[in-house]
Amino acid sequence: LSTLEFDYVILDESQAIKNPSSKVTRAAQLLQAKHRLCMSGTPLQNNTFDVYAQMNFLNPGMLGSVEFFRQEFSVPIDKLGEPDRKEHLRKILYPFILRRTKEQVAKDLPEKQEIVLFCEMEKEQRDIYEAYRNDYRNQILGSIENQGIQRSQLAILQGLMKLRQICDSPAILNEKEEFPNYSIKLDELARQLKEDISDHKALVFSQFLGMLALIRSKLEELGIPYVYFDGSTSAPDREKAIQQFQKQESIRVFLISLKAGGVGLNLTAADYVYIMDPWWNPAVEQQAIDRTHRIGQTKNIFAYRMICKDSIEDKILKLQERKKALAKDIISDDTGFVKNLTREDVEYLFS
C-alpha cells in the first residue's frame, strides 16, 4: 500500500497509533495521501503525549520531534500542571480538530445516568485487603527511599494490581495461598440482577478474567442466561454472542472483558451497565458504557461503577477527575499512569 497514492487516508479509532514507535504507527506514516483524517472518540486516553503521533500523522513535524514535544508540552502539562503550556498546545491543535460530542450529533438520545455504587467490604475481605496494603506500603515506600520512584514503578504497579484484585475478590489473586471467594461486589451484582433489574438487560465489564469467571459461575448458579467474550474469543464467536444478546429476549447479561469490548460494539439491547473494577482511565470506561448509549437506543441508561469504600478504587476517583479535565482542556497504559505518580501520590494511594 505504501507504493500507492490515495486521495484520502482515514484512520478510524486513531488512538491506535498513539505510540510513535509502534509498528502500526510506523506503517500508517508510510501511507501516501493528498488528504488525511483521524477519527477517534478518545484521542487522548492516558496523557498529553497520546495526541502527538496522531497529529504527526496528519501534519508531520508540526509538533516537532518526540523529544521536543515531551520537554515542551508533555512534562510541563502532565507532571507540572503548567496552565500556560496547556493553553499553548490547545491553540496549536485548535485549527485541526473538529470536536463533536454525542449530545451535539444525537440530540434525541435518551438520558444516561452514571452512578458510583459504593460497596462495603465484609470483615474477611477487609482483613485480607489491609494485610496486603500494609505489606505493599512498607515495601514500596522503602523501595522509593532506597532507589527513587522511577526504579520503584514495577513494585508500585504490582501493589496497585493486587489491591484492585482483592477489591473484586481475593480468590482471583494468583498466589500460592488460595483465598476464599469473599466478594461484596459479586454479592451486590447478583442481588441487583436477581431483584432490582430482573426485567432488564445488562452489560458487565471487568478487566480481570478471574473476576469474569467468578461472575459466570454465579450467573449459572442463579440460572441467569448470559453470553460472554474476552480477548481470546474468535471474531465469528464474538459476532454470534452479539447477535444472541441483541435478539434473544431470554439472554439478560453480556459479560465482557473491558479491553476486548471497549470499542466497535453496538449493544443497544442493554439499558444497564456495570463496571466491576473502575480504574484510572475514565475514557476507557466511558467507551464501554457507550456500547449501549448510542444511536438506536430508546431506553434510559443506568451505568454503575462498583467501588469498594475506603480502598485503592475509592482514592483513584479523584485522579480520574484530573484526567477528564486534561482531555477537555486540550481537545475543546497502566505504566503511563504510574510514571506520573509522585511520592505523595503513592503515600496517599496506599494509606
Located regions from the model:
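ASCE P-loop NTPase motor core, strongest for the SF2 helicase catalytic module
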Residues: 1-81, 90-351
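Long, charge-dense, solvent-exposed interaction surfaces that engage phosphate-rich ligands
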Residues: 86-88
